[in-house]
């Protein structure tokens, strides 16, 4: 009778890990509001990292110890050229705060001549996606 109880306990433990909730990382954004709002940046983070990736990432970099930071900067030069720099980083977490000591970091940048503000914002979103994908690929092999 002792063995079935152990087997049942093992099955319950295994089942709970299969149906575990998707981990939620602390993500902070410090972008220039003219190019990207915080809500847009957080939506890009959410779309770039799916549930499967987050679960795998949590095994190597636990939610309680790590978080992400993004920053999109740029604007227009005097010659009306849109210049954008986007950076994504994995940083250590200390309680509810992130420590700016990047473990992994990636920067993507580009410039586009004769761009409107809408074009410049779209370019900023593309560059942030590239930076996030680069950091993600350096963390776990997909």
Model-flagged regions — what are they?
Residues 40-52, 78-95, 122-129, 142:
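Short, Lys/Arg-enriched charge-dense amphipathic segments
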Residues 33-36, 77, 116:
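A short acidic, often aromatic-flanked loop/helix-cap motif at beta-alpha or helix-coil junctions
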Residues 2-55, 139-142:
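A structural "domain/chain start" motif
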Residues 55-100:
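Surface-exposed short loop/turn segments
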Residues 43-59, 101-114:
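Generic detector of solvent-exposed, compositionally biased contiguous segments
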Residues 95-141:
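Short secondary-structure boundary motifs at beta->alpha junctions and helix caps
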Residues 21-25, 66-70, 104-108:
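Generic preference for hydrophobic/aromatic residues in regular secondary structure cores
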């Amino acid at each position: 009778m002792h063995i079935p109880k152990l087997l049942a306990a093992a099955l319950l433990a295994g089942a709970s890990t299969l149906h575990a909730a998707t981990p939620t990382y602390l993500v902070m954004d410090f972008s220039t509001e003219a190019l990207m709002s915080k809500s847009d940046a957080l939506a890009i983070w959410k779309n770039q990292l799916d549930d499967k990736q987050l679960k795998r990432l949590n095994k190597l970099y636990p939610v309680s110890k790590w978080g992400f930071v993004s920053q999109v900067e740029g604007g227009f030069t005097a010659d009306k050229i849109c210049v954008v720099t986007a950076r994504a980083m994995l940083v250590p977490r200390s309680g509810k705060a992130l420590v700016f000591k990047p473990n992994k970091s990636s920067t993507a940048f580009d410039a586009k001549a004769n761009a409107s503000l809408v074009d410049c914002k779209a370019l900023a979103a593309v560059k942030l996606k590239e930076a996030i994908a680069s950091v993600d690929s350096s963390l776990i092999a997909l």
